[in-house]
Amino acid sequence: MSTLDVQTFRDAMACVGAAVNIITTDGPAGQAGFTASAVCSVTDSPPTLLVCLNRGASVWPTFNENRTLCVNTLSAGQEPLSNLFGGKTPMADRFAAARWQTGETGCPRLEDALASFDCRISQVVSVGTHDILFCTIESITRHPAPQGLVWFDRGYHALLRPAC
């Protein structure tokens, strides 16, 4: 069996569209957040999702210690916020760029996110360079934004909500 090279894998994954999310935490280790597209549902009984986080990321120790997080799914027009949380911008500046509320777990919840999933990390599995965080959902908040936001082919794209 041949070993695939990293670039081939990344090029193929660029063909897989995914929602754009800002993952936040707050607790004993402090406040932190990052942009992620490696998020998906696991089961609805109990409601659980997963988030993949590189163990080499500057935010990893904070999430690892706090053991809570909020997945904030972005809507179209929130690309600048995604870029802030995806770069080297200081944490205080990231959070100052938007309006937040405190979720049930104490994590920051983006006021105008398409959906926010306030969670407790229930299990962590390490694979390669990343930890897979299995997250039990404590509460969900939805916003009636007209368009979703996805990352596809290395760029942002708006998704129109169908008219009812």
From Swiss-Prot:
GO terms for molecular function: FMN binding; FMN reductase (NADH) activity; FMN reductase [NAD(P)H] activity; riboflavin reductase (NADPH) activity. The keyword Oxidoreductase applies. GO terms for biological process: nitrogen utilization; uracil catabolic process. The keyword NAD applies. Keywords: Flavoprotein, FMN, NAD, Oxidoreductase. It catalyses: FMNH2 + NAD(+) = FMN + NADH + 2 H(+). Its EC number is 1.5.1.42. InterPro entries: Flavin_Rdtase-like_dom, NADH-dep_flavin_reductase, RutF, Split_barrel_FMN-bd. It is an enzyme of class 1 (oxidoreductase). Catalyzes the reduction of FMN to FMNH2 which is used to reduce pyrimidine by RutA via the Rut pathway. Belongs to the non-flavoprotein flavin reductase family. RutF subfamily. This is FMN reductase (NADH) RutF. It comes from Enterobacter sp. (strain 638). The gene is rutF.
